[in-house]
Amino acid sequence: MRKKIIFVCQDCLSRNYVMSWSKQVLNRLIINKYCKHCNQKTKHLDSF
């Protein structure tokens, strides 16, 4: 079964991206994505 993950910008804490991930993986994901609120590429953490 897959789980829905929402990514949160580390700088402004806005929730920008949504992804699905398997429940078997327990590692935290950190990705570099563009944040439209910060107007730059920032690190995004997953929020279960």
Swiss-Prot record:
Q: Name one GO cellular component term.
A: cytoplasm
Q: Which InterPro entries match?
A: Ribosomal_bL33, Ribosomal_bL33_sf, Ribosomal_zn-bd
Instruction: Report which superkingdom the organism of origin falls in.
Output: Bacteria
User: What molecular function terms (GO) are annotated for this protein?
Assistant: structural constituent of ribosome
Give the UniProt keywords, A-Z. Answer: Ribonucleoprotein, Ribosomal protein
Q: Name one GO biological process term.
A: translation
Has UniProt tagged this entry with the keyword Isomerase?
Answer: no
Pfam families cross-referenced by the UniProt entry? Ribosomal_L33
Q: Which family does it belong to?
A: Belongs to the bacterial ribosomal protein bL33 family.
UniProt-recorded name of the protein:
Large ribosomal subunit protein bL33B
Task: Name its species.
Answer: Mycoplasma pneumoniae (strain ATCC 29342 / M129 / Subtype 1) (Mycoplasmoides pneumoniae)
